[in-house]
Amino acid sequence: VFAADAPVLIQNATILTVTKGEVKGSILLQNGKIAQIGEKVLAPQGATVIDGSGKYVMPGIIDCHSHIMAEAINEGSVSVSSMVGIEDVLNPEDIAIYRALAGGVTTANILHGSANSIGGKTIVMKMRWGRNADDMKFEGAMPGIKFALGENPKRAGASAGRGGAPGTGGRYPATRMGVEDVIREAFNNAKIYQANWADYNAKKAKGEIAIPPARDLQMEPLVEVLEGKRLVHAHCYRQDEILMLLHVADDYGFHIQTLQHVLEGYKVAQEIAQRGTGASTFSDWFAYKMEANDAIPYNAAILTKKGVVTSINSDDAELMRHLDKEAAKAMHYGGLTPTEALSLVTINPAKQLKIDNRVGSLEVGKDADVLLYDGDPLSNFSKVLKVWIDGHEYFDRDQEIDGRPKKEADKKALITKAAAAQRATGGGRGGAAATTGDPNK
């Protein structure tokens, strides 16, 4: 996609491939891909050679649930907002991108919010800091859509100012029963829309005169879900609503790709695993609202051991900066191995987003989304030193620290210049002098 950088060879490092064990040796990044991994790798001409003695290399971290780059994430005026898309309102200058890079995040699933039973379209992005939003899109990644169950869509329907209590007014639904009904009714309509287009296409193929159905931007993404062309990421907490959504999907013949948060997933892990649905959860958040009261820090480990592809996500710009340490908690709470813990933020979210052929592990031919640490990534004392995406270096800890004095000096100079300009124009906005009193006198 972008001009190729010079090859990068990291030597004498501990390489955590995640899927193929641990290698003591070298890794070569070339032409945006992982070119070689082995005990000894020769440096090609023009390569940047890095001594990785005492250091660790691992795949870039993937966050399956993020809202960075977006400000207004909920189109909460309707219960089904599948016609809107988060990809059209992303801010590539959000400083949270750079901070996520500093914590090793290279890819994120940017989601619509959880105010709607069926929310807006989602998109997978690479943290290519300094690029425009289009250039940050993960090329070829499947599109998604956000669903939400429980308190959030209920609250949006019957909050203060919108009726005040369930059943007294405001936007439907106001109960968990209503949330299920909204989803079922939407897919009833989607199946009708799908059938109308199928009938039109069949007549057209036979050479018959046919009038195409009116295009419906709300229904199109749901038809894509029915046809397996769009992934469903569903916000949920309680075991009853988790089972409800799985049963709805069974009835209408579509797949729930990931259950997001899924704090009571440990109670119904077998049912989740049977359907091949993934779980993207917090490490140890609990009791921050009523439906989170039964959350336990063993959730990720239990789900993993029951055969559910499980990831740890952030849902928060600050938490996103230390997802590696969040994953490490599953070693204490549940006894996961170091490789299983790393998988929670690498290969597992890659599988959930269906991008594991490109990222999520260190394998020859995969994208060169690579992290260099000064120690074991699962240690609280280890720090990210460098981050590469597609073989291009997007973060260097030493350069960041060394450059801070100049940044502060530049910032101070700009503030001084702006203040002087404001004084010269009288301090008013737009260059006009400030006035007092009634301007009509």
Regions inferred by a protein language model and the residue ranges of each:
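Extracellular/periplasmic ectodomains of large secreted or surface enzymes and adhesion receptors
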Residues: 5, 305, 386-441
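C-terminal cap of metal-dependent C-N hydrolases
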Residues: 13, 363-407
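Divalent metal-coordination and catalytic microenvironments
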Residues: 13, 32, 54, 65, ...
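Histidine-rich, glycine-flanked metal-binding segment
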Residues: 15, 19-58
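Metal-associated gating/positioning segment near the N- to mid-region
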Residues: 52-123, 131
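His/Asp/Glu-enriched, well-ordered alpha-helical/loop segment
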Residues: 72-75, 79-84, 231, 270-273, ...
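Active-site gating loops and adjacent loop-to-helix segments of metal-dependent hydrolytic enzymes
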Residues: 74-90, 131, 148, 153-160, ...
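Polyanionic/metal-chelating signatures
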Residues: 101-256, 260, 383, 389, ...
